[in-house]
Structure formats: structure tokens, C-alpha cells
């Protein structure tokens, strides 16, 4: 019995950060389900709504490197507890305030709290599981975590319609608090932590290592390409997709959220599929292909006038698959730096990636206000027609195409540099 208990103990410990990782997807998608209510609550336009959505990503991105350092210095139990409680309190603040600036602060804090989601899972896996199981457990974690994105769509929308958004928001806030306290009282580190991915000797964070990343033009171009291509997920999928579908096809919120959920279904399969493609065709070719495919999907989507749920589900499923290009970006980045700089490189790329969400939400909101036709509802809140949505969302395929061009050029340049190095090594060996 004791052996059996110890056999399943790592999975029990893994459960707590995993629950928070899945939960934070629901808070991330919350504005997409509440656009009209939020605009009415704070008497704001699309530009301010985009800013409100963007502040989540500001908080999330700026904490990537600090959270990684905190998890190494303190236990995962303490850090996940603090950040989960912060998420819950910030969600309560957002629910009950009518002050727009407090709402901005609360969304920023929710982003800060959510930043420990994946990093906390990674830390616990590295402590409790053998090194050979790390990749498999990370894959399982992403699969379970994306369920938060799936259930954060239509199911949550249906609950909102039944019980009201404020009641649902309060329940979600208390769930975060419960996860935090459960983690604090139940999660532990192994008494004898065996060497694993995070336990192998490594250098502590040094400014010189970070400077090496910031002075690499290839890393910057890779990061900028990633930012430009992230609009399909963090711009459209996270926030603007649901209101767009409701306006374009006159469907209810639940059906629109259900269609958007196919993006997250696609992401369940995208990681392994694109990894196989990258081995055959190369990282940069696959990333470029994903960007051009995104552009094509959005051209088809924005030109479509007839509501066809099967067609839309298929497009969003494919979109979800190619949104996993971000995994290949990390792989490409790892090949550009020395092993000692790998961790800080991944954190930097992920930071810029999440800033892409802030960029797209802000720009989309601004463009919507530019093309606002002047309609207001009974509360005096702006109503945006389909043309405002189409003009604003056109930024997504334009940026995806631009990012693809940059990434293809970077791929050619990296390959040329690699060939030159090999040629020099060959000449030296021959000499």
C-alpha cells in the first residue's frame, strides 16, 4: 500500500499546478464572453476595451523571467499559492469595480497571477518525475490545460446566461482562491529531489547572459516574427473572435464560443504534428508555412458571408493546429544560442510573444473606433457593425504575412551563416 501511494504521489502533486494552469485559460478568455457587458459596466468604447484586454498580457509577459527566478529561489508551493490568491482577489476587484482604471489594474494583476501557470507545472514536473518523463508530462499538461480554453468558451457562456455574469465571476474568483490554498496545504517538494531538468547544475541569472540575447539580431527578428503572427490566437481567438462571429452571422454567444473552441481543439494536435513537420522541412520553413496559412484562413473567414458551422469549425481547427508554430519558434531560438543561455532565451521569446496579445488588442480596438458607424444602444454604449470588425481584424492576416516573410528571410540568412561556418571548418581541416 505504501509503495502504491508513493507511485501515485507525483501525479497528486502535479494535479495542483495543473488545475491552476487550466483555470487561468478561463480568465484569459473572459473578456471575449463579456464584451458588451464590460463596455456597458465601464461606459467605454472598443479602444478602451482593447486596452483592458491588453493589460492581461502586459502583466503576464513582464513576469515571465521574474517568476522563473522566484520558482528557483522559493518553493513552487509558496509561489503558486501567492499568485493564485492574487488572481482570485484581482478577479473580485474586476467584478465589483465600476472604475475603469481599477479594472485595468485588476486585469494586469490577473495577468501577473496567471504567469505562474505553465512555469509552475514545469517546476513541479521537474521535481517529482524522472527526466525521461519530462517531455511526456509537459505534453499531458498542455492537453489538460487547453481544456480550460475549451470549457472556458461555450460551457462558461451557457452558465453566464443561466446565472448572470457577476455570479459566475465571483465563483471563478473563489475557485482561484481555493486552488491557491489547496496548493499551499497539499503541495510539497520531494525530500530527496533527484537530479532532473531543473536540478542539473546551471548558472544563475546573469545580466551578461541577457545582454547576449538582446544583442542577437536573429533572436530579435525571430521574436518580432512571433509577435506579428500571434494575432490569430491572442488577438482573435482569445477576445475578438466571439463578438465577431455574433455580429457577422447573427448567432448567439454560446454558438460563437463553441466555434472558437475548435481553435483549442486543434492545438491539442498541433504541437506533435508541427514537430514532425519541422524535422522533415526545417523550423523556419514550417513557421513560414504556418504564417501564410493563417493569412489564407483569415482571408476566407473575412470574405465569408454565409453561416456554415461545419466550414467554420474546420477553419478554426486548422487554425488551432498552425497556432502551435510557437513551439517551433522556441526550437529555432534554442539553436541560435549557447546552452547556458537557453532558459533566458525561451523566457525572452515567450515574453515578446505575450506582448503580441497587447499589441493586437490595442490596435484592433483603435481601428474599430475609427470605423464605428455611430450606432449606440439604449445605455449609450457603442455598437459596431460587421465592417468595423472586418477592417480591424484585417490587421491579423496582414501581420501574419509580414511575419512569415521575415521568418523565411531569417531562415535563409541562418542557413547561409551555417554553410559559411561549415565551409571554413572544412578549409581549415583540409589545410
Per-region residue spans from a language model:
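Juxtamembrane intracellular "pre-TM" segments in multi-pass secondary transporters
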Residues: 2-6, 191-223, 428-430
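Extracytoplasmic
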Residues: 12-46, 62, 236-242, 360-365
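Extracytoplasmic gate region of multi-pass secondary transporters
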Residues: 31-33, 217-271, 357-365
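Helix-to-loop junctions at the C-terminal end of transmembrane segments
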Residues: 63-75, 271-282
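Cytoplasmic membrane-interface "Motif A"-like loop-to-helix N-cap segments
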Residues: 73-83, 279-292
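Paired small-residue
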Residues: 90, 101-109, 310-318
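Cytoplasmic helix-loop-helix junction between adjacent transmembrane helices
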Residues: 106-144
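Helix-loop-helix hairpin linking two adjacent transmembrane segments in secondary transporters
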Residues: 140-189
Amino acid at each position: 500500500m505504501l509503495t502504491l501511494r508513493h507511485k501515485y504521489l507525483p501525479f497528486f502533486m502535479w494535479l495542483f499546478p495543473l488545475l491552476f494552469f487550466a483555470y487561468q485559460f478561463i480568465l484569459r478568455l473572459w473578456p471575449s464572453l463579456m464584451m458588451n457587458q464590460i463596455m456597458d459596466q465601464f461606459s467605454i468604447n472598443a479602444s478602451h476595451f482593447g486596452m483592458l484586454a491588453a493589460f492581461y498580457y502586459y502583466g503576464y509577459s513582464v513576469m515571465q523571467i521574474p517568476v522563473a527566478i522566484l520558482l528557483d529561489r522559493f518553493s513552487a508551493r509558496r509561489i503558486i499559492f501567492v499568485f493564485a490568491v492574487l488572481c482570485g482577489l484581482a478577479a473580485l476587484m474586476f467584478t465589483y469595480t465600476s472604475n475603469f482604471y481599477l479594472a485595468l489594474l485588476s486585469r494586469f494583476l490577473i495577468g501577473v497571477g496567471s504567469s505562474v501557470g505553465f512555469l509552475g507545472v514545469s517546476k513541479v514536473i521537474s521535481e517529482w518525475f524522472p527526466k525521461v518523463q519530462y517531455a511526456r508530462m509537459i505534453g499531458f499538461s498542455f492537453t489538460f490545460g487547453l481544456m480550460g480554453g475549451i470549457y472556458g468558451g461555450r460551457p462558461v457562456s451557457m452558465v453566464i446566461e443561466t446565472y448572470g455574469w457577476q455570479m459566475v465571476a465571483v465563483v471563478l474568483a473563489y475557485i482561484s482562491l481555493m486552488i491557491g490554498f489547496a496548493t499551499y496545504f497539499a503541495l510539497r517538494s520531494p525530500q530527496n529531489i533527484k537530479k532532473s531538468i531543473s536540478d542539473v547544475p546551471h548558472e544563475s541569472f546573469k545580466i551578461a547572459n541577457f545582454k547576449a540575447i538582446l544583442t542577437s539580431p536573429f533572436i530579435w527578428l525571430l521574436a518580432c516574427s512571433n509577435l506579428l503572427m500571434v494575432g490569430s490566437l491572442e488577438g482573435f481567438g482569445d477576445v475578438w473572435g466571439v463578438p465577431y462571429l455574433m455580429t457577422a452571422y447573427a448567432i448567439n454567444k454560446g454558438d460563437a464560443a463553441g466555434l472558437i473552441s475548435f481553435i483549442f481543439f486543434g492545438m491539442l494536435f498541433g504541437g506533435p504534428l508541427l514537430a514532425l513537420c519541422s524535422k522533415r522541412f526545417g523550423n523556419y520553413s514550417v513557421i513560414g508555412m504556418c504564417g501564410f496559412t493563417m493569412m489564407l484562413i483569415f482571408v476566407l473567414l473575412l470574405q465569408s458571408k454565409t453561416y456554415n458551422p461545419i466550414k467554420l469549425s474546420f477553419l478554426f481547427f486548422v487554425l488551432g493546429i498552425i497556432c502551435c508554430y510557437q513551439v517551433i519558434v522556441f526550437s529555432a531560438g534554442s539553436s541560435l544560442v549557447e546552452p547556458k543561455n537557453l532558459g533566458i532565451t525561451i523566457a525572452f521569446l515567450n515574453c515578446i510573444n505575450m506582448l503580441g496579445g497587447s499589441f493586437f488588442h490595442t490596435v484592433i480596438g483603435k481601428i474599430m473606433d475609427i470605423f464605428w458607424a455611430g450606432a449606440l444602444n439604449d445605455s449609450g454604449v457603442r455598437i459596431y457593425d460587421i465592417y468595423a470588425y472586418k477592417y480591424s481584424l484585417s490587421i491579423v492576416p496582414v501581420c501574419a504575412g509580414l511575419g512569415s516573410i521575415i521568418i523565411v528571410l531569417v531562415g535563409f540568412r541562418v542557413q547561409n551563416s551555417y554553410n559559411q561556418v561549415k565551409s571554413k571548418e572544412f578549409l581549415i581541416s583540409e589545410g
